[in-house]
Amino acid sequence: AGNRRPIWIMGHMVNAIGQIDEFVNLGANSIETDVSFDDNANPEYTYHGIPCDCGRNCKKYENFNDFLKGLRSATTPGNSKYQEKLVLVVFDLKTGSLYDNQANDAGKKLAKNLLQHYWNNGNNGGRAYIVLSIPDLNHYPLIKGFKDQLTKDGHPELMDKVGHDFSGNDDIGDVGKAYKKAGITGHIWQSDGITNCLPRGLSRVNAAVANRDSANGFINKVYYWTVDKRSTTRDALDAGVDGIMTNYPDVITDVLNEAAYKKKFRVATYDDNPWVTFKK
């Protein structure tokens, strides 16, 4: 049992504060939250909008900073709202509304908001690990902006809690080049997927897993989205993913409890560093 792969069950499109408890109570140890930006590259709402996944309400939202405060409560030990199981948050950054030259600025503004409203200026803030998920390889300067702002504000150590993802289903080699340009090594999650309304094969997941498991790969963790069926869950686990994003965390939980999967996998806890590649 000591060598089971830790799995992150990632609740999809958790954009209202009330949904945090809803998804964690169904078995999610991680959530994905959409972040929309205004014209000045300020994070504005936790909002997805239409269209979104089949069977979901696309329009739930909060003001970004309000959501961060709710998230902080849910991930701060001792808080009455604390959810011990919630250990990772993926911010799906909707930077498509921005010009490429605003990416750095968006990163700075995002960092300022997280520092104040989530990390409580470094004073016993939320403890979850954070993945900044960027849809466009050209927006890699967002990462530098984020890092520079935390450093400027005196909290470079918080980058220990921050990881990265490019979510555009780009060629894995091109993703690697973007990280080189950004000067990033480590803390890398690689997503692959499509809306639950459409089927998608696992060929790119297999490529990402192969990179992760190779001696000179740059990827630390691979996740697949959006998975709502038991059969797809099994296929993804068989392919060796580390995370599964879902609208139904209880479905993923059920599969992980099946005898064949219980032997090889377990639900990740706070003690599982999400930046460390799992070695079989």
Curated annotation (Swiss-Prot):
It catalyses: an N-(acyl)-sphingosylphosphocholine = an N-(acyl)-sphingosyl-1,3-cyclic phosphate + choline; an N-(acyl)-sphingosylphosphoethanolamine = an N-(acyl)-sphingosyl-1,3-cyclic phosphate + ethanolamine; a 1-acyl-sn-glycero-3-phosphocholine = a 1-acyl-sn-glycero-2,3-cyclic phosphate + choline; a 1-acyl-sn-glycero-3-phosphoethanolamine = a 1-acyl-sn-glycero-2,3-cyclic phosphate + ethanolamine. GO terms for biological process: killing of cells of another organism; lipid catabolic process. Keywords: Cytolysis, Dermonecrotic toxin, Disulfide bond, Hemolysis, Lipid degradation, Lipid metabolism, Lyase, Magnesium, Metal-binding, Secreted, Toxin. One of its GO terms (cellular component) is extracellular region. Its cofactor is Mg(2+). Pfam families: GDPD_2. CDD domains: GDPD_like_SMaseD_PLD. It comes from the Eukaryota. It is found in: Secreted. The keyword Protease does not apply. Dermonecrotic toxins cleave the phosphodiester linkage between the phosphate and headgroup of certain phospholipids (sphingolipid and lysolipid substrates), forming an alcohol (often choline) and a cyclic phosphate. This toxin acts on sphingomyelin (SM). It may also act on ceramide phosphoethanolamine (CPE), lysophosphatidylcholine (LPC) and lysophosphatidylethanolamine (LPE), but not on lysophosphatidylserine (LPS), and lysophosphatidylglycerol (LPG). It acts by transphosphatidylation, releasing exclusively cyclic phosphate products as second products. This is Dermonecrotic toxin LsSicTox-alphaIA1.
